[in-house]
A protein has these predicted regions:
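OB-fold/S1-family RNA-binding modules
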Residues: 1-76, 178-195
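Conserved glycine-centered short motifs in functionally critical loops
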Residues: 66-195
Length: 195
């Protein structure tokens, strides 16, 4: 599993691995490895704010620049991403503000999809846009962001209800499935972090 992750990510960006373990015999190109003591590892973990970043990656709400947010709901049949504006978009230039917010949201949604390893059917409920040209800009932004994804991703376009429909091939478990487990206290309707 580790070798696959290193290979996939090192192909796009150089990676430095900090670990208490000795490196595998063969490291993919672009990977450097540094073996640390337990104390050094804890300090590096704390300095990189790893726990905070993991909590953010598992959070349902993702803040956007400008005050908006994404709300990500993973379900058995599909995953939905709802784009919320930071303020009510009702001014005369409301359509322009909506498109700008949607373009920011498209970039962050694509990043979250990769980060969380979301797959299957994905529906994104962008802020309402009335212009076909504006919808085309948002589709182009999603296609550009998806082009960086090694996993096969297809943008199908907007549905008649105005939802952006896309699919992404499942290659392994989602981040949520990997790092959390069903909550026994609520009979499996919620999830808690694994130990």
């Amino acid at each position: 599993m580790l070798s696959v992750l290193l290979r996939d990510y090192a192909a796009r960006h150089p990676i430095e691995v900090l670990s208490r373990l000795e490196p595998p015999e063969a490291l993919p190109q672009g990977v450097t490895w540094q073996t640390l003591t337990a104390v050094e590892m804890e300090a590096a973990w704390s300095a990189a704010r790893v726990e905070k970043q993991v909590d953010e990656a598992l959070s349902r709400r993702v803040p956007l620049p400008g005050g908006g947010s994404l709300i990500i709901d993973e379900r058995e049949a599909l995953t939905t991403i709802d784009v919320n504006s930071g303020s009510t978009v009702t001014a005369a230039d409301g359509e322009t503000l909506a498109v700008e917010e949607n373009l920011r949201a498209a970039a962050e949604a694509a990043r979250q999809i990769r980060l969380r390893n979301l797959s299957g059917i994905l529906l994104i409920d962008f802020i309402d846009m009335h212009s076909d040209m504006d919808r085309a800009r948002v589709i182009a932004a999603m296609e550009e962001a998806a082009a960086d994804d090694r996993v096969k991703t297809v943008i199908h376009g907007f549905t008649s209800l105005g939802l952006l429909e896309m699919t992404r091939k499942r290659t392994r478990d989602t981040l949520c499935d990997t790092l959390t487990q069903p909550c026994d206290a609520c009979h499996g309707t919620g999830r808690v972090r694994r130990d």
